[in-house]
Amino acid sequence: MATFSQKPAEVVKKWVLIDAEDLVVGRLASLVANRLRGKHKATFTPHVDDGDNVIIINADKVVLTGKKYTDKKYYWHTGHPGGIKERTARQILEGRFPERVLEKAIERMIPRGPLGRRQMKNLRVYAGPNHQHEAQQPEVLDVAALNRKNKGNA
């Protein structure tokens, strides 16, 4: 029997809705990254975008374990000499775009390259409880019920 290799035309994508309220960032990001890549499917093929479309709501209510809320730093560089900047997870979560903490965690778990960028386009993250994808009839995935450690103690 030959190894199965899926073609892009054969891909069937589902829509999945996840409520991130009180969920641990890293555990949620790991699960979502696998969903976006399609590794949860028996038809997984490394060079094909086989993952599901994932919608995450309440991304502003995620939980960071330990002292990461105050101590974890996100760095970027402006491109100018001495242009290294940093911001803590607390500053981002209390700032204008709190969903970026979760987006960055997921983005850094996806392989870099053209396929990874395409798979990241299948992710929609919203800070509040509302989203505009009701027409896709997303299937609700209860991440907290999968493992007791997925839910934060907050």
From Swiss-Prot:
Keywords (alphabetical) are: Ribonucleoprotein, Ribosomal protein
Which terms does the record give in the GO molecular function aspect? Answer: mRNA binding; structural constituent of ribosome
Superkingdom of origin:
Bacteria
Presence of keyword Ribonucleoprotein:
yes
CDD domains listed in its UniProt record: Ribosomal_L13
Read off the Pfam families from this record.
Ribosomal_L13
GO cellular component: a single term? cytosolic large ribosomal subunit
- What are the GO BP annotations of this UniProt entry? negative regulation of translation; translation
Homology family: Belongs to the universal ribosomal protein uL13 family.
* Assembly behavior: Part of the 50S ribosomal subunit.
Stored NCBIfam families: rplM_bact
Function of the molecule: This protein is one of the early assembly proteins of the 50S ribosomal subunit, although it is not seen to bind rRNA by itself. It is important during the early stages of 50S assembly.
Protein name, per record: Large ribosomal subunit protein uL13
Its gene name is rplM
